[in-house]
């Protein structure tokens, strides 16, 4: 943790990256030779699909090299990646975002040490390696998430951002706004939808809170076979708040999508919206969405959940965005992919897109993003607040584990089930998935 915080301050913000692997045996790969093959990128983030499609088109126009971008549906990346890698024309470029995925996909990952794209990196300290010590997955951006706040609406309700410093004060403000929703014309929280395009925010990102604090207390430094669920009551605190102080409650949560929640916030119908720095472009600059929110009205605060000392917490910082190259692809396609990756991180077009869509990137030519959420993350760190790292990167069989948590949350929230079922899905589900993944 000390090393992490030190690096975070040195880099302005932490870069918590993930990876996978195989031995580097051809140092000529990615050293600038003209690619003769083609690129097939299986993209992880639906919200960045248009940006990647546009960039791919630009690269093809400039070089003549075909770049195909396919984007998996939210929550379906692992399933689609497994299927696509088995095809005769598999992805040449894909994403592996945590240590568990290293175990699953390591045999497909090309060693990236000594390639040009890796030489462009400003830090390699958080690039994960395989069992042989080879770097096979590089993190291309750093992200932060928390509770996004519409400060203008908050002020209309009679509050300032400084009034919220912990769970108690967050609940007090949210309860009051919800009670006056008809009068104010807006509610406290946007929909905490349990539909697939939204549920990852809670089975993954909100679930990180109890995992982070448990791992911090127990000095966990590698993927554990079991967890205790020490802070699940704190998870419940926030979940109950999200699903009570909102216009969308009960059965409606099962069909509320990520777009639904985003639109409620973007259209000024809610003060609070749990999401991340990647939402900035959608909220502020997107012509497609049409929100065009004023950046000065936006802020991001920590996810407060009632843990002692949380007044000194910062935002949740890290990344699941890590590039991998398919070592089983054709030689010319591997070369084309490495050349494309280098162009993305060095060209004006590529670095502009990365800054706008993803924020801070660990490359020499990276542009400084205008994203106000990173300014908030920096401010918390500069004030000495601790960073809430991405403990969920150690989740075993992540899609299956999260699906179990979502099912239990649905039973609890919609059907009046017991919170004990959520605890079972969380704790026992972890042990079950770990055993399946590790034999």
Functional labels for PLM-detected ranges:
Residues 84, 91-92, 118-154, 187, ...:
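A structural signal for short loop-to-beta-strand junctions that line the ligand-binding cleft
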Residues 97-149, 201, 205, 295-302:
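Hinge/lid segment of periplasmic solute-binding proteins
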Residues 139, 356-363, 378-434:
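C-terminal capping/gating helix-and-loop segments adjacent to ligand/active sites or protein-protein/ligand interfaces
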Residues 113-126, 193, 211-237, 287-293, ...:
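Short, solvent-exposed loop/beta-turn-alpha elements that line the ligand-binding surface or hinge
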Residues 136-140, 145, 171-224, 270:
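Extracytoplasmic/periplasmic solute-binding protein
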Residues 58-124, 152-158, 165, 264, ...:
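Extracytoplasmic "Venus flytrap"/periplasmic binding protein-like
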Residues 62, 156-157, 288-356:
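Extracytoplasmic/periplasmic substrate-recognition and gating elements
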Residues 174-175, 221-255:
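Glycine-centered hinge/linker elements that transmit conformational signals in sensory
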């Amino acid at each position: 943790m000390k090393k992490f915080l030190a690096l975070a301050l040195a880099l302005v913000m932490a870069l918590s990256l993930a990876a996978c692997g195989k031995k580097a045996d051809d140092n000529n790969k990615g050293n600038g030779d003209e690619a003769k093959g083609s690129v097939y990128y299986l993209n992880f983030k639906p919200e960045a699909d248009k940006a990647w499609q546009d960039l791919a088109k630009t690269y093809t126009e400039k070089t003549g090299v075909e770049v195909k971008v396919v984007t998996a549906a939210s929550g379906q990346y692992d399933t689609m990646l497994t299927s696509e890698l088995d095809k005769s024309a598999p992805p040449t470029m894909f994403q592996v975002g945590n240590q568990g995925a290293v175990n699953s996909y390591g045999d497909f990952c090309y060693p990236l040490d000594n390639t040009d794209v890796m030489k462009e990196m400003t830090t390699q300290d958080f690039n994960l390696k395989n069992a042989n010590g080879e770097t096979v997955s590089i993190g291309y951006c750093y992200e932060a998430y928390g509770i996004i706040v519409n400060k203008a609406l908050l002020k209309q309700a009679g509050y300032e951002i400084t009034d919220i410093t912990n769970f108690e004060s967050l609940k007090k403000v949210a309860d009051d706004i919800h009670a006056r929703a008809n009068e104010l014309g807006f509610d406290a929280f946007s929909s905490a939808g349990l539909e697939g395009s939204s549920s990852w925010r809670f089975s993954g990102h909100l679930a990180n809170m109890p995992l982070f604090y448990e791992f911090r207390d127990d000095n966990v430094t590698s993927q554990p076979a079991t967890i205790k669920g020490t802070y699940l009551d704190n998870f419940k605190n926030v979940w109950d708040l999200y699903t009570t102080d909102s216009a969308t409650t009960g059965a409606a949560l099962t069909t509320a999508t990520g777009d639904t929640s985003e639109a409620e916030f973007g259209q000024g119908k809610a003060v609070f919206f749990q999401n991340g720095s990647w939402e900035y472009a959608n909220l502020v600059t997107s012509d497609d969405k049409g929100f065009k929110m004023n950046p000065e009205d936006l802020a991001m605060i920590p996810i407060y959940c009632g843990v002692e000392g949380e007044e000194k917490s910062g935002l949740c910082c890290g990344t699941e965005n890590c590039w991998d190259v398919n070592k089983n692809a054709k030689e010319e396609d591997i070369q084309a992919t490495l050349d494309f990756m280098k162009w993305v991180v060095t060209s004006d077009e590529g670095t502009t897109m990365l800054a706008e869509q993803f924020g801070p990137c660990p490359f020499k030519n990276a542009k400084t993003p205008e994203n106000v959420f990173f300014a908030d993350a920096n401010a918390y760190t500069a004030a000495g607040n601790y960073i809430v790292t991405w403990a969920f990167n150690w989740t075993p069989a992540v899609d299956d584990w999260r699906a179990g948590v979502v099912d239990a949350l649905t039973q609890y929230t919609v059907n009046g089930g017991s919170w004990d079922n959520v605890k079972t899905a969380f704790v026992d589900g972890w042990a079950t998935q770990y055993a399946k993944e590790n034999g």
